[in-house]
Amino acid sequence: MKEMKPQYIYKATVTKVVDGDTVDLLVDCGFNIIRKERIRFYGVDAWETRGEEREDGLKAKKFVQDLLPIGAECIVRTGKERGKFGRYLGEIYIDGKSLNEMLLEEGHAEVYKK
């Protein structure tokens, strides 16, 4: 997975796990500024929750939900880059570990190639 740049690091709280590579977060930007953002996991492509990949996609989503239940706190590292649907791209950290990397290691996603 290639490195993101420039990088910004924020504390965030999970409000929804959309699928295996997208979450909705309340991002603490500092100075009492909280933003709702949909974050697409940078550099990974999880299986889709619809169509032929549905079963694997639901497993990927559950993997993320188990690690990031609603209300869980995490760290999001992001840049100015947005994905094709306008979502910020980010790397999510739980207890210092990259969720993006965990998805790849556990076989719930592949390296994003597009």
Predicted features and spans:
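Small beta-barrel nucleic-acid-binding modules, primarily SNase/OB-fold domains
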Residues: 1-114
